[in-house]
Each structure stands twice: as C-alpha cells, then as structure tokens.
C-alpha cells in the first residue's frame, strides 16, 4: 500500500509533530479552534492493524469540531488558510474538511494565504503531521493515493 506525505502549510514555529507507525485508515479527527487552529488530535488504524490515538498537538481550548468517519467514509479534501494571528507570524488559521459522504466540517477563521488539497479518485487522507506550540503552526497530510 503506497503512502504519500504532502505538505506542510503554515509557518516554521513550534516543534515538529509526526506519527511513528504508518497509517492505513483514519477513524476520526478532533480540532479545537478560535481565531486560529488551537489543537488537533486524531485516531487511526496503523499498517500493523493496531489503533492509535495521536495528540492533541497544540494546546488551548476553543470550539470543538469532531469528525467521526463511518466505516466506508474517508476525507477527500482539505483546504484552509495560514497567516499572522496574535503576535505569531504564520500559523494555521482555518481548516475545511470534506468527506466522501459529502459531510463538510469547518474550524477556525479564514485569514491569510489559502491552501487546498483536493484528492483524485480513490485518494484519501489517512493521517497528519505538522508543527505546533500553543497553536497549530503548520499542517501536512498522509494520503493513500
């Protein structure tokens, strides 16, 4: 099974965040946001068949956006913005996630430079990596094409 790492979008602040076991299927995502993306956590099934709970990366509280994917549902598109917020030069300010069941989830406030990752045909997001401190500085995705 091929795995592709795409990104990062955002700034260079914070610490690098990544997973150690390659992902096979994304189960769910929880995002906390306000004027920016404050934290992200997710669950996935690894290529070893085990379930992993990752994060939260970032910190702080805010509005919770919970995405629980059905057994045959997957994320087919992620877009968002990144730019200056508070006294930080470049962080992820907004995320929009669309699933194969045409469910759309939004978190944060659109502000800054736009990015979009529409996936072709059967491609789907199976995990995340990025940079975080007290907020999400940058985000990238793992994709099964």
UniProtKB/Swiss-Prot annotation:
Spans of the sequence repeats are: 6-15, 54-64
InterPro entries per UniProt: Jacalin-like_lectin_dom, Jacalin-like_lectin_dom_plant, Jacalin-like_lectin_dom_sf
Q: Which domain of life is it from?
A: Eukaryota
Q: In which tissues is it expressed?
A: Sheaths and roots from mature plants and seedlings.
Q: Where is this region: 2 X approximate repeats, Gly-rich?
A: 6-64
Coiled coil (UniProt feature): none
Which UniProt keywords are listed? Lectin, Repeat
Q: Which SUPFAM superfamilies match?
A: Mannose-binding lectins
- State the Gene Ontology terms under molecular function: carbohydrate binding
Relate the induction remark in this record: In response to salt and related osmotic stresses.
Instruction: Report domain Jacalin-type lectin positions.
Output: 3-145
The record's Pfam families line, in alphabetical order, gives: Jacalin
Entries under PANTHER family matching the protein = OS05G0143600 PROTEIN (PTHR46506)
Name of this chain's protein: Salt stress-induced protein
Origin organism is Oryza sativa subsp. indica
């Amino acid at each position: 099974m091929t795995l592709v790492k795409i990104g990062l979008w955002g700034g260079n602040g914070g610490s690098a965040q990544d997973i150690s076991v390659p992902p096979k299927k994304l189960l769910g995502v929880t995002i906390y946001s306000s004027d920016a993306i404050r934290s992200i956590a997710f669950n996935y099934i690894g290529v070893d068949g085990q379930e992993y709970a990752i994060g939260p990366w970032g910190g702080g509280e805010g509005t919770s956006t919970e995405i629980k994917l059905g057994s045959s549902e997957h994320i087919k598109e992620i877009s968002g913005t990144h730019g200056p917020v508070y006294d930080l030069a470049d962080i992820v300010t907004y995320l929009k996630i669309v699933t194969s069941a045409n469910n759309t989830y939004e978190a944060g406030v659109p502000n800054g430079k736009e990015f979009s990752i529409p996936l072709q045909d059967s491609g789907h997001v199976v995990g995340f990596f990025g940079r975080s401190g007290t907020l999400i500085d940058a985000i990238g995705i793992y994709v099964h094409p």
